[in-house]
A protein has these predicted regions:
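Residues at the starts of beta-strands that form the adenosine-phosphate
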Residues: 8, 107, 139-141
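Short, small-residue-biased leader/transition segments that mark boundaries at the very start
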Residues: 1-12
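Glycine-rich phosphate/pyrophosphate-binding loop and the adjoining helix
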Residues: 119-120, 126, 130-230
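N-terminal beta-loop-helix "entrance" segment that forms/cooperates
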Residues: 13-33, 151-158
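Helix-loop-strand module that forms the ligand-binding subsite of alpha/beta enzymes
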Residues: 12, 36-135, 218, 222
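Structured loop/turn residues at beta-strand edges in well-structured enzyme cores
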Residues: 5, 18-21, 51, 103, ...
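Positions that flank functional sites
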Residues: 15, 65, 148
Length: 231
């Protein structure tokens, strides 16, 4: 049955996050010590919240074909929670080192957004979290990739939905994804497909756009311009 679910979130740009210095203090052979930033920034508190959570949603825009620098800086701080001198083998058969499983191995959802329509644009982020899952034994229970950000807008917009009805269905799919996470702890494949669908109202757009044929791409650009609502 449905239950009340809390979704606390952390906005990284509002948090104080220092970068890993690769100083090696946390991996000292004599005495593994806390990160040098342990008492001076917000990372330890964020790790505690992650440890207490049932699952984690890693959400990021695509910046220059990768996740945001802030998210990458934060994830690099996981180094201090592992023991690199103790080798292990992941469930996928990959050699790695001892990790803080209570943080790193939580089930997670990857949520990526970008303005560009090409499938290559978010691929580095998708690949990163796929690799993360394999090495850390963290089940990826959902992958939501929303391209065409300038077309779909940043929230409910009746004008956009009237112009492009697919947008309404996409937002409904995201709401359904939230319900499924709360009730079942994972997003159904069909829901992911609805949420990730192309919103450009052209037949077979997702298939045809893979063809790197410039005249055809120019036609797509013209159609995309028609969809945009002047702010």
């Amino acid at each position: 049955p449905p239950r009340s679910t809390l979704f606390p979130y952390t906005t990284l740009f509002r948090s104080h996050i220092e970068r890993c210095l690769a100083c090696g203090r946390c991996q000292s052979k004599k005495n593994q010590r806390p990160c040098v930033h342990e008492q001076t920034d917000d990372v330890a508190a964020i790790f505690r919240r992650m440890k207490e959570s049932d699952l984690i949603i890693y959400a990021t825009p695509v910046y220059v074909f990768a996740m945001s620098g802030l998210l990458k800086t934060f994830l690099e701080r996981l180094y201090a929670k592992g023991v690199v001198s103790e080798l292990t083998v992941s469930k996928k058969g990959l050699i790695f080192h001892k990790i803080a499983a209570a943080i790193c191995s939580k089930p997670f959802v990857t949520l990526v957004c970008c303005d560009n329509l090409e499938r290559e644009t978010p691929q580095n982020v998708i690949d990163y979290f796929d690799t993360f899952s394999k090495f850390t034994d963290a089940p990826q229970v959902g992958l939501l990739v929303r391209n065409g950000g300038q077309l779909s807008g940043g929230g409910k917009d009746p004008m956009r939905e009237e112009k492009v009805p697919k947008i309404y269905d996409v937002y409904e799919a995201y709401r359904q994804a939230g319900r499924e996470l709360a009730q079942a702890g994972r997003i159904e494949r069909a829901t992911q497909q609805r949420a990730n669908r192309e919103i450009v109202p052209l037949p077979f757009f997702s298939l045809i756009k893979r063809l790197h044929f410039r005249p055809l791409k120019k036609k797509f650009v013209e159609k995309a311009r028609e969809m945009m609502v002047t702010r």
